[in-house]
Amino acid sequence: MDIQQQTRGFRYFYISVWRFILHLKARLIDDQINIRAGHLAYVTLLSLVPMIAVTMSMLSAFPVFKGIRVNIESLVYSYFLPAAGDSAQVYINEFVNNASKGTFVGIIALLVVAILLISAIDKALNNIWRTTEKRSLVVSFSMYWMVLTLGPVLMGSSLVATSYVVSLELFSQSELSGLLPWLVERLPMLFSVASILLLYMVVPTQKVRFFHALLGAVVAALLFEAGKRAFAYYVTQFPSYEAIYGALATIPILFVWVYLSWMIVLVGAEITAALPEYLDDPFEKDGTKATTALTENKEVDESEPNQGNDTIA
């Protein structure tokens, strides 16, 4: 009896997972995330230099963050621009330095362009959650401004805290000496999960369950890590872009990677938004209904040939 119950439980689990995959597939097609990812990639490339300029300006305002600017740059370029980070870093740093020397009107223009990216992310995620409630202009501007001002500060604080923790004598002991490289190696992954989790929890105007957002963030972070490795391998082993575009190869490589990154983020958002729809479905709440329906359909399919034979006889 226990074996039968376990078999039935595993069977229902696989059926539920398969039904959720079908539900997620229909959602991905309906939301046209490839088009949304393309729009976000375009806005991101337009806003990339202003966002980095604003971030570095915010970090420069706090003396405690002066020594970690290089660490933040290396983290961003190595993690978010795989294989194209070296050449892209030179161009982007030059653009940022030129932008930081602008006038007051130019700085305001940079802020407006940076806010455009946050606004595009806001609209894309709320469309995925099918939310009809809209934030007021004051609330939206306050949230965007908070992201621009507090985001770099939180990023810098996390790096400072991490540097302090790993420098403690506790990690220099022989028992924990092997733990330090393991933690440092997984910091980008944890940073990615935390960032995507915060994105899924804060941006939608409706309430998002923490476990659903965490699951979507973990899946997106894993896909992001796998995509980063696969994309870096493709760029290094099959340098077709460099053969075609030459010195301008950084531009299409950067655009393709930004597009893939937004595809991954939107897939994680679709998983997060689809989970409550699927789990709150009355048909899925009863664990026996899915299995019963499948069994009934199978019995009907098996009985149809027999009925046909009886009719012929």
Curated annotation (Swiss-Prot):
Topological relation to the membrane, as annotated: Multi-pass membrane protein
Source organism phylogeny: Bacteria, Pseudomonadati, Pseudomonadota, Gammaproteobacteria, Alteromonadales
Alphabetically ordered keywords of this record: Cell inner membrane, Cell membrane, Membrane, Transmembrane, Transmembrane helix
Ranges annotated as spanning the membrane: 45-65, 102-122, 136-156, 183-203, 207-227, 247-267
Disulfide bonds: none
Keyword Cytoplasm: no
InterPro entries documented for this protein: UPF0761_bac, Virul_fac_BrkB
Gene Ontology CC terms: plasma membrane
The family this protein is said to belong to: Belongs to the UPF0761 family.
Protein's UniProt name: UPF0761 membrane protein Sden_3448
Domain of life, per lineage: Bacteria
HAMAP family recorded: UPF0761 (MF_00672)
NCBIfam families noted in UniProt: PRK01637.1 (NF002457), yihY_not_rbn (TIGR00765)
Region named Disordered: 290-313
Subcellular compartments: Cell inner membrane
